[in-house]
């Protein structure tokens, strides 16, 4: 049997052995639909279909990673210098860039997390890749991104009551470019 006939034979078998669920005239399955493995039950948290993790688990991990980065910034022995230089021996991309940047801590007590690492450009111009010196004919600008944070919403002082939290997107600088 040559390969076109084999392929046709396999196709016929797969159609014959495939799901034989009867369908009505509109193409929908008859009977009650059973939930699939990703469908939430009465006591299950829905899963994100793309990453198959619980949405709140990602947010907790995100906030934990931000907290670790802020702790590293606070405990850093490197002085907060604003020098425009590229160090190609360093692994960190923010120091190897032609528009290097450093990080500072953006603090807001009415936000969760209260501290966010925010990039600040170390050069006014950009580093020339041939001379490795700052070239002011170009401009170094911050790159902004929106990050999810929770805003603490409390009632005005005359009325005591519990604070609520609302997830909002906040724009912060995450790096610099030429």
UniProtKB/Swiss-Prot annotation:
Disulfide bonds: 121-176, 126-178
Region (Disordered): 21-44
Lineage: superkingdom: Eukaryota
Carbohydrate-modified residues: 75
Gene Ontology terms for molecular function: cytokine activity
Subcellular location: Secreted
Alphabetized UniProt keyword annotations: Cytokine, Disulfide bond, Glycoprotein, Secreted, Signal
Any Pfam family: IL17
Broad class of the protein's primary localization: secreted
BP terms from Gene Ontology: inflammatory response
Entry's Gene Ontology cellular component terms: extracellular space
Secretion signal span: 1-22
Coiled coil regions, renumbered to chain: none
InterPro entries (alphabetical): Cystine-knot_cytokine, IL-17_chr, IL-17_fam
Gene3D superfamilies: Cystine-knot cytokines
Record bears the keyword Glycoprotein: yes
Keyword DNA-binding included in the entry's annotation: no
Function: Stimulates the release of tumor necrosis factor alpha and IL-1-beta from the monocytic cell line THP-1.
Family: Belongs to the IL-17 family.
UniProt name for this protein: Interleukin-17B
Organism: Mesocricetus auratus
């Amino acid at each position: 049997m040559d390969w076109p006939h084999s392929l046709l034979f396999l196709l016929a078998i797969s159609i014959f052995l495939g799901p034989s669920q009867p369908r009505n005239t509109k193409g929908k399955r008859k009977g009650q639909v059973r939930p699939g493995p990703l469908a939430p039950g009465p006591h299950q948290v829905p899963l994100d279909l793309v990453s198959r993790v619980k949405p709140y688990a990602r947010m907790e991990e995100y906030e934990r990673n931000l907290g670790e980065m802020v702790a590293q910034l606070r405990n850093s022995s490197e002085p907060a210098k604003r020098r425009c230089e590229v160090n190609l021996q360093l692994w960190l991309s923010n120091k190897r860039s032609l528009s290097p940047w450093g990080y500072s801590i953006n603090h807001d007590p009415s936000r969760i997390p209260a501290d966010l690492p925010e990039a600040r450009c170390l050069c006014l111009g950009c580093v020339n890749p041939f001379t490795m010196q700052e070239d002011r004919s170009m401009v170094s600008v911050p790159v902004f991104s929106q990050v999810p944070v929770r805003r603490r919403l409390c009632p005005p002082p005359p009325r005591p009551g519990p604070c609520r939290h609302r997830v909002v997107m906040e724009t912060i600088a995450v790096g610099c470019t030429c």
